[in-house]
C-alpha cells in the first residue's frame, strides 16, 4: 500500500521533479555520457524490468547477472562500461545495490519515471510475497508443522551466512591492513557491542585516509547537472522520505510506528555491505533493544527472504510486520510493514537520482573507493559476528551473557544443544559449500528434512 501511495504521489510531482532532475537522455544529449541504444518504447523497458523483478532470486550476485544479461547482452540498452560504472557506484551506496542498479538503468533509459518504474518493479513482487508469508507466520508460526519446517530453514540460513562470509572475505581481505580492519570490527561488535554505524564510519575514515589522491588526468567530463539541481533533488526526496515520519509523530497513536519509521530510516543510511552485514546491527536492536522479535524469528525472516524474489533487505518488511502485529494485530502489522518499506526504499531513489549524473566522475575518485574497500573489510568482521550470533541462538536453547569489564561474551549452556540443528547444518554445509547447490534448493531440502526430524523426535 505504501509503495502504491508513493507511486501516485510521485506521478503527481513528475512535472516538478523534471525541472530539477536531469534524466539520462538529457545527459546524453549534452554529450556528457557514452552513447547507448534506446529501447523502442517505455513499455518494452517496463516489461523487461518486470521480468527482472519476478525472476530476481538468489541474492545480489544472481540478480546483477540477470540484469546484465537482459540490459546489456540481449537488448544493448547499456554498454559494458556504463553497466560496470553504475555497478561500482551502487556498491558505494547504502542499501540494496541490485535494486539501485535497476533504478539507475531505468533512469538512464527513461528519466525519473523510468527509474521509479524499474525500482518499484524490482521490489514489489518480493514485497508482496514476503508480506503474505509474514502473515502466515504470524498466525500459524507456532503450529508443529511450521516449527518443523523452520527448524531446517534456520540450519540452512546459518550456512548461507557462513558462505557469504567466505565470499566477502575472499574479495575484501587483499592486504594485511584489511585483515586488521576486519579483526577490529569483529572485536568491536562482538565483544564491545559497538553500534554498526560507528564501525562503518570508522572504517570509511580509515580507508579514505590511506587511499591515494584523486586522478588528475583531466579525461573525465564534469557532471551534466548543476549543484543547484542536485541540491533540489536531494531536498525533494528528503521531503518525500521524511513526510510520513513527521505525520506519524504528529498523529500516530501507536508508538511502534514512530519507532519503526525512525529506526529503519537510520538503518537505510548505514546498510553498507549488504543485508548480511546490517542484520547483526538490526538483530541487536530489534531483539535486545526494542524487543519486537526473538532471535529465532529473525532467522526465520531471513530464511523466508532467501526464498523470494527481490532484495534480501526485504527481511526488514518481515520484521516491521511482526513488530506491528505483536502490538496491535493485523491492521497495525500492515501499517508497520508499509512504513518499513517506505523508509527502506525511498532513500534508494534519493541516492540514485541525486548521484547518477556523477557516476563517471566518482569512478575516478580513489579516496571514495578506498573508503568502500575498508567498509567491505569491516563487513567481514561484522558477518563473522552475525555467523556466531546465529549459530549460538540456533544451536543452543539457553545462552547467558557474561560481562568482563567493558567486554561482554555470550556463554551457551552446552547441555541445551539441539543435535537436530547440528545434523541439518552439517548437511547444508556439504551441499552449499562443497557441491555448490543453489540456495533455494538447499533451503527447501532443509525445510523438508527439518519437518521429518521434528516429526520423528
Describe the residue ranges of each PLM region.
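Multi-pass membrane proteins that catalyze or facilitate reactions on polyprenyl-/lipid-phosphate substrates
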Residues: 11-93, 104-308, 312-457
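Intrinsic low-complexity, disordered N-terminal segments enriched in polar/charged/small residues
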Residues: 3-5
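Conserved beta-loop-alpha segment that forms the PLP phosphate-binding cup at the N-terminus of a helix
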Residues: 100
Amino acid at each position: 500500500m505504501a509503495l502504491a501511495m508513493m507511486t501516485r504521489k510521485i506521478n503527481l510531482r513528475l512535472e516538478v521533479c523534471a525541472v530539477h532532475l536531469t534524466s539520462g537522455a538529457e545527459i546524453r544529449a549534452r554529450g556528457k555520457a557514452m552513447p547507448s541504444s534506446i529501447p523502442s518504447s517505455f513499455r518494452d523497458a517496463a516489461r523487461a524490468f518486470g521480468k527482472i523483478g519476478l525472476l530476481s532470486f538468489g541474492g545480489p550476485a544472481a540478480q546483477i547477472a540477470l540484469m546484465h544479461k537482459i540490459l546489456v547482452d540481449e537488448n544493448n540498452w547499456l554498454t559494458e562500461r556504463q553497466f560496470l560504472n553504475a555497478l561500482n557506484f551502487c556498491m558505494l551506496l547504502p542499501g540494496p545495490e541490485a535494486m539501485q542498479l535497476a533504478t539507475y538503468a531505468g533512469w538512464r533509459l527513461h528519466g525519473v519515471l523510468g527509474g521509479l518504474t524499474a525500482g518499484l518493479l524490482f521490489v514489489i513482487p518480493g514485497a508482496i510475497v514476503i508480506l503474505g508469508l509474514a502473515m502466515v507466520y504470524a498466525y500459524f508460526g507456532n503450529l508443529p508443522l511450521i516449527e518443523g519446517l523452520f527448524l531446517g530453514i534456520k540450519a540452512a540460513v546459518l550456512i548461507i551466512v557462513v558462505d557469504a562470509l567466505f565470499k566477502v572475505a575472499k574479495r575484501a581481505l587483499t592486504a594485511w591492513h584489511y585483515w586488521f580492519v576486519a579483526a577490529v570490527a569483529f572485536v568491536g561488535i562482538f565483544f564491545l557491542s559497538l553500534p554498526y554505524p560507528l564501525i562503518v564510519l570508522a572504517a570509511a575514515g580509515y580507508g579514505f585516509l590511506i587511499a591515494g589522491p584523486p586522478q588528475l588526468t583531466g579525461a573525465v567530463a564534469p557532471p551534466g547537472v548543476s549543484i543547484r539541481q542536485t541540491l533540489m533533488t536531494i531536498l525533494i526526496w528528503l521531503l518525500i522520505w521524511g513526510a510520513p515520519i513527521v505525520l506519524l509523530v504528529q498523529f500516530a497513536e501507536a508508538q511502534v510506528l514512530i519507532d519503526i519509521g525512525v529506526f529503519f530510516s537510520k538503518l537505510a543510511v548505514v546498510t553498507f555491505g549488504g543485508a548480511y552485514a546490517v542484520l547483526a546491527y538490526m538483530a541487536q536492536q530489534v531483539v535486545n533493544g526494542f524487543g519486537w522479535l526473538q532471535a529465532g524469528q529473525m532467522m526465520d525472516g531471513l530464511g523466508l527472504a532467501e526464498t523470494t524474489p527481490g532484495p534480501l533487505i526485504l527481511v526488514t518488511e518481515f520484521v516491521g510486520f511482526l513488530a506491528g502485529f505483536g502490538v496491535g494485530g493485523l491492521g497495525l502489522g500492515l501499517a508497520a510493514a508499509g512504513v518499513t518499506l517506505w523508509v527502506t526504499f525511498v532513500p534508494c531513489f534519493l541516492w540514485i537520482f541525486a548521484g547518477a549524473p556523477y557516476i563517471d566522475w566518482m569512478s575516478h575518485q580513489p579516496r571514495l573507493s578506498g573508503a568502500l574497500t575498508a567498509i567491505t573489510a569491516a563487513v567481514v568482521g561484522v558477518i563473522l559476528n552475525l555467523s556466531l550470533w546465529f549459530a549460538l541462538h540456533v544451536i543452543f536453547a539457553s545462552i547467558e551473557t557474561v560481562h568482563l569489564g567493558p567486554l561482554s561474551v555470550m556463554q551457551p549452556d552446552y547441555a541445551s544443544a539441539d543435535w537436530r540443528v547440528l545434523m541439518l547444518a552439517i548437511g547444508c554445509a556439504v551441499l552449499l559449500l562443497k557441491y555448490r547447490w543453489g540456495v533455494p534448493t538447499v533451503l527447501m531440502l532443509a525445510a523438508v528434512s527439518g519437518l521429518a526430524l521434528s516429526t520423528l523426535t
